[in-house]
């Protein structure tokens, strides 16, 4: 059977569905595949100053990771995918949110003298994201997902809008931290927390992709 290939005429989401393991490259290039999954791949790639033909060639050279569970998500039932999202994204991300909050609070005290202005901004932006996500996850788990699995018609437009709002805040955080770049005098905690924020961003993008581009489209 011929291998499916990514073409420049696809949307970003369609390209990811061909090979979910291109998510890592898209994340590295800061190409939005979650809330921006509906956008043309050509448009998203060229907006980053990349040549679409060479970029698509690179994407098609990415070998699927055999141990990866990403491709399995496309074969899951609604119930299996909901369970996967809760276990692999909601639970770990709630822990990350708490961990990052505590780490940023510590950094505010340790690096107050030289970096309080930047850290105030980062802390406030991050806490705004956390304030959005904690009730969002709870609503999905306690209301929207159970009704959806029970066969009820669920309007996901509100959740998608919330995803987009959080995505915009996350993009702003990405920019003000210069892609989570630590200042030259940053301590080990500084490095760890900024690394954790970068990992959280990538994980949340993948999480939102599974919801917007797979789960919410299921009948």
What kind of feature is each model-predicted range?
Residues 1-219:
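Small-residue-biased structural context
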């Amino acid at each position: 059977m011929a291998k499916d290939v990514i073409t420049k005429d696809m949307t970003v989401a369609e390209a990811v569905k061909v090979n979910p393991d291109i998510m890592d490259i898209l994340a590295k290039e800061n190409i939005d595949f979650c809330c921006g999954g509906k956008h043309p791949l050509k448009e998203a790639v060229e907006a980053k100053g990349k040549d679409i033909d060479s970029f698509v060639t690179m994407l098609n050279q990415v070998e699927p990771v055999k141990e990866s569970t990403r491709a399995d998500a496309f074969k899951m039932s609604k119930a299996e995918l909901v369970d996967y999202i809760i276990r692999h994204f909601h639970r770990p991300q709630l822990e990350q949110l708490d961990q990052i909050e505590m780490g940023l609070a510590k950094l505010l005290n340790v690096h107050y003298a030289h970096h309080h202005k930047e850290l105030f901004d980062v802390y406030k932006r991050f806490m705004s994201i956390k304030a959005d996500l904690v009730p969002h996850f709870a609503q999905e788990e306690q209301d929207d997902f159970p009704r959806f699995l029970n066969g009820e018609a669920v309007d996901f437009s509100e959740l998608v809008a919330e995803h987009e709002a959080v995505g915009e805040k996350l993009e702003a955080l990405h920019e003000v931290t210069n892609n989570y770049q630590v200042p030259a005098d940053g301590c080990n905690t500084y490095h760890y927390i900024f690394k954790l924020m970068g990992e959280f961003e990538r994980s949340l993008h993948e999480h939102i992709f599974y919801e917007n581009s797979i789960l919410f489209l299921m009948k």
